[in-house]
Amino acid sequence: MTVTEQGKRARATLAFMSQVDSEQKNKALNAIANMLEKNSDRIIKANAIDLEQGRNNGLSEGLLDRLMLNEERIKAMADGVRQVADLADPCGKILSEYKKDNGLLIKKITVPIGVIGIIFEARPNVTVDAAALCLKSGNSVILRGGKEAINSNTALSEIMRSALDEVGFVKDAIQLVTDTTRQSSADMMHMNEYLDCLIPRGGKGLIKAVVENSTVPVIETGSGNCHIYVDDSADINMAARIIFNAKTQRISVCNACESLVINSAIINEALPVIANELKKKNVQIRGDERAVSACSLVIPASDEDYYTEYLDYIISVKTVDTLDEAIEHINSHSTGHSEAIITQNEANAQKFLKCIDSSSVYVNASTRFTDGAEFGLGAEIGISTQKLHARGPMGLEQLTSTKYLIFGNGQVR
């Protein structure tokens, strides 16, 4: 089946999706969760093929980690689907209601976007998370994953579609594009007749290609060149603990810290402590001249390092003399995802919060919290780094649009 034919099928589901109620959606989601757990052996076997091919093709440790599914991760996916089922239905909410002098009653309500296309890379959990969120928000979804995860994604999509069929829910609300060539992605980018929105999830190259070439409206989920600034008033032990978590807890995710910015007044004392903590996970530290001088574990960085989302056990260090310099450096090198300041100075914290132009800004906490579940949104479709429609973790509410309902009694203009 071509991508265009899948688009037609997805469009044909909208009559059903516009009338489905919360109970039906939740029944379908719980059926998906149960079916995933019941078929964990099948999923793991399919995933093993992808992992073997990935190793043979030289995928990095970070990408293999993103790709890997085991019983624990499958259970987590199933539990995530159940959590989405437990969330309030985002559709049909009355955002405003007022009566005009002419007697017209006007209501503004939330409605599904329609058909959403998602192009992503080697993360099979996206297949399940995205499908669950789209279904709960009343949207149909066409999923196009990377070739690295095709066997895993095929198994997951077939299982989810079977679950929908079992409870009488239209199964074409979830479709997977099995053609992993660039042509299928290119086709989706121009399916304005069938897709209402396109969401890319992956590295800079994928996101850039979709944003620059798509005629379908795009919600951009940016890469994560996340920074932590260590202020001159920082608690050094707290800073080391937060940085260790933000960098090493899971290197392959977009909210991992990739770059440190350290005030020169504290660098000689702070950087050796931070570096020794990072050494526990063999993190390579690349820094400027002052960072290299401050700590023997630091090697020289290039200009390119400060723009790089490593997704690996590597971190860059930039030395600054002032908070203003730190803010300027971060805003000019960040991807607009997540940044943090470690400080005991309230005025500096407030200035950082106001001046940093990213979707999520932290004071004395790890950037790893930028996540739909951690924010109480349930699973997420991605982290939006743009400013229109959605910004930050995209949960159910961000997958809705609005509609005006106008009630009259014979009024004419």
Question: What do the predicted segments below correspond to?
Answer:
Residues S18-Q19, D232, T319, I342:
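A structural signal for short, well-ordered beta-strand elements
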Residues A122-N125, D129-K136, A163-E166, L206-D312, ...:
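ALDH superfamily catalytic-core signature
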